[in-house]
């Protein structure tokens, strides 16, 4: 602000000098006019001189106004305005050159300051962005280190627990070996039972197959009986037909006996007896036919039952065969279990020896884990310190950006060319048409 105040003061001095020169020119003009009045007689001689003085005065007034406009524009922030330096007065031309030189220098300075402020803002933003990333990374590292510290602590506890478990494992290895032998004995017994079960199942299959065969024969015999009953039914039908014909003959005989009066009495008695016998025969045939139908219906039910029984026997045979397969598989598995148990017995002995080696390794791991926990705690502290430093850098960058924003706001009131320090050859001069 002091530099701008100095510039403003310089501009004011320049304007004051211009006003002084203008005032002097006015005075000279007045003196010339006075001389004109005093030397009216010599008007022809001084007319030319007076015209020149008026032209010079007008020129000086125009130049002074142009210079004043350029300085006013600069004072209002427009540093692109320039003045024409050609003048009828050498001093005035020199003043114009000084004004242009001053404005060039001031414009370049303001442009450089604007570029500097922009660079500071961009750099501050990048610093802030990088600081935020580093801060996040530092916090993540700190979090990871804390997790490592907690993990190593849990690991120590786990290793101590593992050491105790290994001692228990070593102690129980012999118990496992003893139990394995007992299981081996039990598996052998199970194999024997499975073998006996397989033999019994095979005998059951043989018996069920025999029953299935006998059932099939029974079904065939019942079907044959049904066929014979059908034939008997046909015979009964024939008898029924004969009885109906006999009834018809007896009826005709009775009619003829009635026509013969007394001579046909004995014949009528015989006809009645034949008719009665035919009725009894018809009733007996109907009874036989009913019984045959009942026997056939019962035989049909028996056949269905026998066929269902045969189907179930077949399914039972299939189930027993599956049971035999399962028993054979159990026997095989039992033999494999027996072999596996023998291997377990050998493995438990090896496990007991290995457990001692593992306990030594666990002790070494516990020591390393404790060292890791200590180092992780140290690194976590350093990461926290780094995070605090990054936050300070971020705060400083934020403050720097704020100040750069303030500077840019102050510089925005000045109008300059786009590129800083490039000169003013292309800048329009004040007073151009």
Swiss-Prot record:
Coiled coil, from the record: none
Keyword check for Glycoprotein: no
Residues in HAMP domain copies: 58-111
UniProt cross-references to InterPro entries, sorted A to Z: Chemotax_Me-accpt_rcpt, HAMP_dom, MCPsignal_dom
Primary location: membrane
Keyword DNA-binding appears in the UniProt entry: no
Annotated family: Belongs to the methyl-accepting chemotaxis (MCP) protein family.
Full protein name: Sensory rhodopsin II transducer
Gene transcribed to yield this protein: htrII
């Amino acid at each position: 602000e002091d530099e701008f105040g100095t510039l403003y003061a310089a501009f004011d001095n320049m304007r004051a000098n211009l006003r002084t020169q203008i005032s002097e020119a006015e005075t000279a003009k007045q003196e010339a006019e006075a001389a004109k009045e005093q030397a009216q007689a010599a008007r022809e001689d001084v007319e030319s001189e007076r015209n020149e003085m008026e032209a010079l005065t007008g020129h000086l007034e125009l130049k002074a106004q142009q210079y004043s406009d350029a300085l006013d524009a600069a004072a209002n922030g427009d540093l692109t305005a320039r003045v024409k330096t050609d003048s009828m007065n050498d001093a005035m031309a020199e003043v114009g050159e000084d004004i242009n030189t001053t404005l060039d220098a001031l414009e370049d300075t303001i442009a450089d300051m604007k570029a500097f402020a922009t660079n500071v803002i961009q750099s501050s933003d990048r610093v802030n962005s990088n600081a935020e990333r580093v801060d996040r990374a530092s916090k993540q590292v700190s979090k990871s280190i804390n997790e490592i510290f907690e993990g190593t602590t849990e690991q120590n506890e786990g290793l101590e627990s593992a050491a105790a478990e290994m001692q228990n494992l070593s102690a129980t290895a012999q118990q496992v070996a003893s139990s394995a032998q007992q299981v081996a004995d039990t598996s052998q017994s199970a194999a024997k039972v499975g073998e006996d079960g397989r033999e019994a199942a095979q005998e059951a299959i043989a018996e069920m197959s025999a029953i299935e065969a006998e059932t099939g024969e029974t079904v065939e015999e019942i079907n044959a009986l049904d066929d014979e009953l059908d034939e008997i039914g046909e015979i009964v039908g024939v008898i029924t037909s004969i009885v109906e014909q006999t009834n018809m003959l007896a009826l005709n005989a009775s009619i003829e006996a009635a026509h013969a009066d007394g001579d046909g009495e004995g014949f009528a008695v015989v006809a009645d007896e034949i008719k009665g016998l035919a009725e009894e025969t018809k009733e007996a045939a109907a009874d036989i036919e009913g019984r045959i139908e009942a026997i056939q219906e019962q035989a049909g039910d028996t056949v269905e039952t026998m066929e269902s029984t045969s189907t179930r026997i077949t399914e039972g045979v299939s189930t027993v065969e599956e049971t035999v397969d399962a028993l054979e598989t159990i026997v095989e598995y039992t033999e494999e279990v027996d072999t596996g148990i023998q291997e377990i017995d050998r493995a438990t002995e090896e496990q007991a020896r290995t457990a001692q080696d593992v306990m030594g390794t666990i002790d070494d791991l516990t020591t390393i884990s404790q060292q890791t926990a200590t180092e992780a705690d140290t690194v976590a502290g350093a990461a926290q310190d780094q995070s605090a430093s990054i936050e300070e850098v971020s705060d400083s960058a934020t403050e720097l950006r704020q100040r750069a924003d303030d500077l840019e706001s102050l510089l925005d009131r000045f109008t300059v060319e786009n590129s800083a320090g490039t000169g003013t050859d292309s800048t329009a001069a004040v007073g151009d048409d």
